[in-house]
């Protein structure tokens, strides 16, 4: 879809470069520029003068631009206690707003975003002694202690080989609560249990997307990567253990989330395998609603790996009771046991609706209503029902997906659900291959082979940007803005991962998470929604690592506006701006701005 053309200039305007004649006009221009600069200062220091003030790039264009020589030189820095702030997962905010949350339903781990007057319009500082992260692939096994100063987990899990503190570094031997001898050996055993060729869990490319719930420090996901399996490692925000923060610092695909009351922000039929290794989730609560949510996101014939003492319940009466109830629930959901060995059981989901149709009338859990959209997943409550397959899936007896990596570039079967042709899909691939090649050419002198590991495409469309990075040693979090959430199913069908999000709110990740952010027409979209561009820039700064890069492709007016703020954001370590080649997805008004964030020290900034 082509972007909207830029708005016309105001009546009587001579454009941004129009000169002024006469003393009164010069004075008026200077006064307008000073007033605008003062308004920006009020915005960013935003407490007393105008806490909800938000300027839009189009408003700046319609009134008066910042004079060529004027740019905002600084932004306030948040207090050091906010160095790990996640605004929408802030426990302190719960108390300030007096939220009445049901802890038994894990509502305190779900998103609760601050209202506009309570947002911190300041830059999140790094912790004392912060260092540029160790590069992949070394980061899989070691990170700087100073970057995540939380060693409680190392002592608590010392007997399970999760992590070990060695002076200024934290090492990850690859252990876990259920796999003391290493995740790699555990993964081989799972493949053997399922009888997969060559003892490889990828099953010749047919297992690609995995959901790991309660993932610890994501060592399971880390050791799946050599098999060309990508896991969405999921765990709640824990102020004491910071498991996901360690995973992201290691460069392992992971995100903050919880099985609570709302659906996971993923479409139906996204994963070939879900994994729970002593994940401490009560799967039996509320009529099995949490297990039914896993069922929703599993593909036809998908596997659920459950490694827990309850699966080996011969001697413990409590475990025997749980195992009996769990087995009964799985059977009523039409799951069958594919393999069981020791403390691990693997269930498999049916390929068709046949078993569902053969259940007794009024059997529980019920089938979901016909008008339920299984792909609706942004702020949607979970439902204790089974999602049936469409007529097409039921007839095909499966997801109709090619093995990895062929599925990356082949038109996915669900394209027709969002009204996109195979031809347009292929053209989209070609366009993004060309765009990414141009971006890397622009950055060539400034980056090295492993400069990027954690990458986010903030407006992912069909996943073309991520697909073009396939031969680079990176992983990409593809974000589908909630207005276009239907496209996320295409991204998953390509063997990529991602999430739904509303960029008017903060993202659910720790500060200093991503090496590269890509924002294509995102600022224009936020402007259309009436959301503050400055809020988005500050959020990008929060999640971008020092020495990280951002690629912003948008209207010229937006790019010019952002450039004025680079010094204040400390994004002026290096930058490049070009007018890109015209293609079927672009307009003549687009520009590309690539910037690099500085590594700055809070104490030094305060002293200067």
Named regions from a protein language model:
Residues 261-274, 285, 289, 493-494, ...:
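A short acidic, Gly/Pro-enriched loop at the edge of an enzyme's catalytic core
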Residues 230-236, 256, 475-480:
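Conserved SAM-binding motif I beta-strand of class I
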Residues 267, 286-301, 512, 529-547, ...:
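A short glycine-rich, Lys/Arg-flanked "PGG" loop and its adjoining helix->strand segment in the class I
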Residues 204-216, 220-222, 232, 248, 304-330, 341, 449-470, 550-571, ...:
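Conserved class I S-adenosyl-L-methionine
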Residues 2-205, 315, 327-328, 332-450, ...:
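Intrinsically disordered, low-complexity glycine/charged-rich regulatory or linker segments
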